[in-house]
């Protein structure tokens, strides 16, 4: 995919109400220059997909083919090309989020659905069209601070990697470099206990990733309260693992609503650990 293809990619993606923008495809190309894919019938663009590699783990997303080309095997070309590309980058496990009705399609390529609590289960897409939140509790058990240059990035990257199962430094660094994005971290003593990120392109705010120690849900709550204080009256979307029932209850109390659910699927062994978490995005895991 090149810059001249962005218009087609955005238009096709948004036939599915994905709220994609040119900036989304620019960012994906920044992370993985060869990972934004276009499929052509001669000179006619007919499909798109994206993939990104994080060491041994890769992620596949933004996969859509024009309706008149579906059922003709062209989507398989995109998917197989993406998997082979990720393999060439050293990826051993490929993850994706799928509409449940597409599980059978992806299973033909070896992807398996994760549906148990130990592996974080399916994904719930939640949204809030007008965020409101009470002031933070100010608990003395832990502190929440906005991430800044004074913090050691390697500590954040290592904490995230222990959960995700691969080094996402290139993603986290790129997100932190954007002034409109927010990141908060929480420490218990001198130990990092959790962090949360939000992406704000100027319209819909995407909250994630969130990663917290599994034994400290209050850290996740406080991180989100602090973040939401900065997002009052904004429209927010986030992606919650279906086994996060305590976090789900917290979000429902804040006025978030469930939009729909997606199936989490892997080609290869999932390395994601159990924890309190929100996905970073649908196209990057």
Label the predicted regions.
Residues 65, 71-84, 108, 216-229, ...:
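Conserved acetyl-CoA-binding loop-helix of GNAT-fold acetyltransferases
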Residues 87, 112-206:
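Amide-forming acyltransferase catalytic core, primarily the GNAT-like/NAT-type
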Residues 180-199, 203-243:
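Flexible loop/N-cap segments at domain edges
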Residues 6, 10-50, 161-183:
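Active-site rim helix/loop that mediates acceptor-substrate recognition in acyltransferases
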Residues 86-99, 231-242:
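Conserved GNAT acetyl-CoA-binding A-motif
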Residues 66, 70, 99, 212-215, ...:
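Residue-level recognition of the GNAT/N-acetyltransferase active site
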Residues 97, 104, 112-134, 237-285:
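Active-site/acyl-donor-binding loops of N-acyltransferases
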């Amino acid at each position: 995919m090149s810059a001249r293809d962005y218009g087609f990619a955005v238009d096709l993606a948004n036939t599915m109400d994905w709220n994609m923008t040119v900036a989304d495809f620019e960012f994906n190309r920044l992370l993985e220059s060869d990972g934004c894919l276009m499929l052509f019938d001669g000179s006619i663009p007919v499909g798109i997909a994206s993939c990104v590699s994080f060491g041994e783990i890769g992620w596949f997303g933004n996969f859509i083919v024009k309706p008149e080309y579906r059922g003709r095997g062209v989507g398989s070309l995109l998917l197989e090309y993406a998997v082979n590309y990720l393999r060439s980058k050293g990826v051993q496990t490929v993850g994706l989020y799928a509409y449940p009705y597409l599980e059978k399609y992806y299973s033909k390529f070896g992807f398996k659905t994760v549906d148990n609590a130990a592996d974080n289960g399916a994904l719930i897409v939640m949204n809030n069209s007008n965020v409101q939140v009470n002031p933070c509790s100010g608990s003395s058990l832990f502190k929440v601070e906005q991430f800044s240059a004074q913090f050691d990035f390697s500590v954040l990257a290592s904490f995230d990697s222990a959960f995700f199962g691969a080094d996402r430094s290139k993603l986290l660094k790129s997100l932190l470099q954007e002034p409109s994005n927010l990141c908060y971290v929480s420490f218990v003593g001198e130990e990092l206990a959790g962090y949360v990120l939000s992406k704000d392109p100027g319209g819909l705010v995407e909250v994630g990733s969130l990663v917290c120690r599994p034994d400290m849900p209050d850290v996740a709550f406080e991180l989100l309260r602090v973040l939401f204080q900065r997002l009052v009256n904004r429209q927010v979307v986030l992606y919650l693992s279906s086994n996060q029932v305590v976090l789900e209850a917290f979000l429902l109390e804040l006025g978030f609503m469930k939009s729909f659910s997606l199936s989490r699927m892997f080609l290869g062994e999932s390395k994601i650990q159990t924890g309190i978490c929100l996905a970073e995005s649908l196209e990057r895991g």
